[in-house]
């Protein structure tokens, strides 16, 4: 009887364990389906600035040294002013790295070193006017702009397909164009999908991303992350981290609604006083070098977002190919090269690679 009881108990125990295991697996499956993908490896990117010359191994070694696993390659098109519909691109007057041939050579060189690519064609308006204000004054000009932009972006979608790049950015900070012509954007995304089968994003300005109407058609919510996070001349890590709290809450909520991860298509801080106050500013009026402000704001960004499940990674703004000749402790611009913040980035990227 004890033997029978023993076997009966064992059988019931196995049934119980099987049932619990099944419920646990089922619950896990439901949880995984309802949540965003979690990866210990993030997109640790640099914005690889176009140059006059071809890229060689000496230009890529510093990118490897900082443990970047992605680079944004950025060919350019140029527009004369905010109401002009013609985009000039891929011309002999441009720097090599701004053209299709140059972008292709950069991609090949980076790929050979195991660095993945976001191809990010961008528009530059003469005199540095903000592209978010690009807006036509007539239907005729809107149609011309649409055709010109289609030619521009399809040219590089074809390059993305040819080079099998991992990620393609369909535009950068073009809010008025998107607000006024949403049907064009949805149509051109379909055209791009027919050519290029990799992942797609759009680089929305930090205060624009909630108004972009086509995130459902893309793979990542791209944000140029120049959020104001601190008012101090030399903010501490704690102050800047507190400044990130509200933005993180907004980003997480938006990611949850769209069921897509946030990708910082650009992020970074200048090495100047008040680096966290208006991080989008690139004008030369801000020229008081403050390396500590850059260090603190950068570390706060890493601490605030990089481990989050809703966060895919980001692309540091910006990284020049001639590493030994740029940046340095007297430089007040965005580049981290040859500044103390470079070591902060190196350590952080290594941990998420």
What are these regions (language model features)?
Residues 99-105, 109, 113, 120, ...:
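Glycoside hydrolase catalytic-domain groove-lining segments
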Residues 119-123, 169-178, 186-210, 259-267, ...:
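Aromatic-lined carbohydrate-recognition surfaces of secreted/lumenal glycan-active proteins
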Residues 30-104, 128-141, 175, 221-227, ...:
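N-terminal substrate-binding region of glycoside hydrolase catalytic domains
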Residues 21-23:
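Bacterial signal peptide processing site
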Residues 50-64, 146-159, 205-214, 295-304:
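Short, acidic/polar
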Residues 17-19:
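C-terminal motif of bacterial Sec signal peptides marking the signal peptidase cleavage site
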Residues 27-34, 279, 283, 295-300, ...:
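Aromatic-rich peripheral "rim/lid" segments of glycoside hydrolase catalytic domains that contact
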Residues 69-85, 100-178, 272-274, 317-322:
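Substrate-binding cleft and catalytic face of glycoside hydrolase catalytic domains
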């Amino acid at each position: 009887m004890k033997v029978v009881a023993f076997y009966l108990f064992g059988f019931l125990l196995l049934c119980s364990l099987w049932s619990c295991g099944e419920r646990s697996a089922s619950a896990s499956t439901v949880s995984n389906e309802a949540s965003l993908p979690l990866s210990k490896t993030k997109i640790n990117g640099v914005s690889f600035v176009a140059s006059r010359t071809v890229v060689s191994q000496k230009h890529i070694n510093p990118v490897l040294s900082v443990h970047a696993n992605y680079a944004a390659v950025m060919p350019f098109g140029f527009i004369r002013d905010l109401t002009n519909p013609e985009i000039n691109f891929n011309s002999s007057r441009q720097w090599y790295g701004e053209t299709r041939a140059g972008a292709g050579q950069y991609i090949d060189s980076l790929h050979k070193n195991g660095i993945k690519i976001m191809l990010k064609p961008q528009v530059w308006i003469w005199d540095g006017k903000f592209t978010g204000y690009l807006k036509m004054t007539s239907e005729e000009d809107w149609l011309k702009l649409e055709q010109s932009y289609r030619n521009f972006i399809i040219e590089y979608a074809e390059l993305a397909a040819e080079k099998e790049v991992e990620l393609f950015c369909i535009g950068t900070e073009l809010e008025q164009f998107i607000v006024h012509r949403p049907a064009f954007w949805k149509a051109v995304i379909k055209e791009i999908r027919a050519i290029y089968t990799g992942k797609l994003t759009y680089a929305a300005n930090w205060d624009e991303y909630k108004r972009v109407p086509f995130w459902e058609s893309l793979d990542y919510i791209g944000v140029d992350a120049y959020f104001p996070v601190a008012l101090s001349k030399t903010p501490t890590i704690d102050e800047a981290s507190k400044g990130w709290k509200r933005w993180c809450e907004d980003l997480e909520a938006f990611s949850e609604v769209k069921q897509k991860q946030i990708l910082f298509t650009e992020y970074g801080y200048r090495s100047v006083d008040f680096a966290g106050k208006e991080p989008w500013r690139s004008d030369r009026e801000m020229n008081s070098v403050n390396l500590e402000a850059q260090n603190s704001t950068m570390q706060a960004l890493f601490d605030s977002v990089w481990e989050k499940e809703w966060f895919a990674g980001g692309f540091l703004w910006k990284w020049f190919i001639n590493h030994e000749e740029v940046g340095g402790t007297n430089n007040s611009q965005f580049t981290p090269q040859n500044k103390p913040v470079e070591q902060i980035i190196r350590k952080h990227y290594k941990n998420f690679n």
